Amino acid sequence: MGIVMVKLKVMPVSPEVNKDELSAKIKETVESMDIICRNIEVEPLAFGLYAVFPLIEMEEKEGGTEPVEEALANLDDVESVESVEVSLV
């Protein structure tokens, strides 16, 4: 098994959700799963809405990114989570 870099797209439930607090929750959740969070970018979309893009490094294993996606989707203030890029390192 190898190491993969995964870029996730995390959408908050509303524009009122604090970007910094959400980014901190994402990083804390990812790192509690023994996954490395390399970077977090916040990109504006429209009408005050934004998306958070954490870049994570994890071991390639059965189930892929599902466990981390589910953990992030269960956070308060998160509407949806999806993988937008996955590459083998």
Curated annotation (Swiss-Prot):
Key words, A-Z: Elongation factor, Protein biosynthesis
InterPro entries assigned to the protein according to its UniProt record, in alphabetical order: eEF-1beta-like_sf, EF1B_bsu/dsu_GNE, Transl_elong_EF1B/ribsomal_bS6, Transl_elong_EF1B_B_arc
Name of a matching Pfam family: EF1_GNE
Domain of life the protein comes from: Archaea
GO molecular function, one term: translation elongation factor activity
Function: Promotes the exchange of GDP for GTP in EF-1-alpha/GDP, thus allowing the regeneration of EF-1-alpha/GTP that could then be used to form the ternary complex EF-1-alpha/GTP/AAtRNA.
Family, per entry: Belongs to the EF-1-beta/EF-1-delta family.
Identification of the protein by name: Elongation factor 1-beta
UniProt source species: Methanococcus aeolicus (strain ATCC BAA-1280 / DSM 17508 / OCM 812 / Nankai-3)
Lineage: Archaea, Methanobacteriati, Methanobacteriota, Methanomada group, Methanococci
Protein encoded by which gene: ef1b
